[in-house]
Regions:
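Hydrophobic transmembrane alpha-helices and immediately adjacent juxtamembrane helices
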Residues: 1-265
């Protein structure tokens, strides 16, 4: 509880450091911050060409004429956020090692710096997604405001995971590479490129175990199906229960290891 209070107290510092981190990530490159937004657009374009133009994928049997691109970007949007947050935040304590060694600095906020930095790109991507929907003539309904709720959800899930992975990475430096590999495989056990109906029947219950299933499908409920999150009470309770449990585990490990961080930097 004390750590949460200290994080809230230092929220302005978190925001300031996150802005600096976001700018420094592309400092020195000719196009600068443009690269932060170009990369997800290029990735989406590749998947769109492969799955819709090449494989003729139709993910919604009940809506066979619904554009695959719109279905894809609704699922990719939260995934990009989690992927960016995990891959950049796991190594955050090493990257900010010079700060960790300062006894008076609240190192509890360091993992949040990277996640907030990733959230900046996520906000842009949400705007881009809404713009593409409008171009296609799919005007977002009030259900689209639910993306704020689901964004908070993926943010909290990222925080819960990163406290664990960043703490372990200080003592086991291969953790960052392991997380990167896991994230590559994890994309395919969530219905992002393929719909749930396109997976084998035995895999469909397994998909729902992944907390990101709730988030990805939530974005699509907000933009495509127009279904409220309150219409999935069991999934909602399950998701937040997992987040809380993972946060408790992550914070416990982080707190136990924190006194030794500076010694191994």
């Amino acid at each position: 509880m004390n750590s949460l209070k200290s994080i809230i107290k230092d929220r302005k510092m978190i925001l300031r450091l996150a802005k600096n981190d976001f700018k420094n990530k592309f400092a020195g490159s000719y196009f600068g911050l443009i690269w932060a937004f170009v990369q997800p657009v290029v990735i989406v374009s590749i998947y769109w060409i492969v799955f819709e133009k090449g494989l003729r994928s139709r993910p919604l049997p009940e809506m066979p004429d619904f554009p695959y691109l719109l279905w894809l970007i609704a699922g990719m949007c939260p995934w990009f956020f989690l992927n960016d947050a995990m891959n950049t935040s796991t190594n955050c304590l090493i990257e900010y090692g010079y700060i960790v060694k300062k006894m008076k600095f609240n190192i509890d906020i360091i993992p949040l710096i990277k996640i907030v930095s990733a959230a900046f790109v996520h906000c842009f991507f949400i705007v881009l997604v809404l713009a593409i929907y409008i171009v296609y003539g799919k005007i977002p309904t009030p259900y689209a405001f639910q993306m704020i709720y689901y964004s908070i959800g993926v943010f909290c899930f990222s925080v819960a995971l990163v406290y664990l992975t960043s703490a372990i990475n200080v003592f086991f430096r291969d953790m960052a590479q392991i997380v990167g590999i896991i994230m590559q495989y994890a994309m395919w056990v969530i219905p992002i490129m393929l719909s749930e109906s396109q997976y084998p029947a035995f895999m469909r219950p397994i998909l729902k175990i992944n907390p990101m299933y709730y988030i990805v499908e939530g974005y699509r409920d907000s933009l495509i199906r127009h279904i409220g999150f309150w219409e999935h009470p069991l999934q909602t309770v399950y998701f937040w229960a997992v987040v809380i449990i993972m946060f408790i585990i992550g914070r416990t490990v982080f707190t136990k290891m924190k006194p030794h961080f500076a010694d191994v930097m």
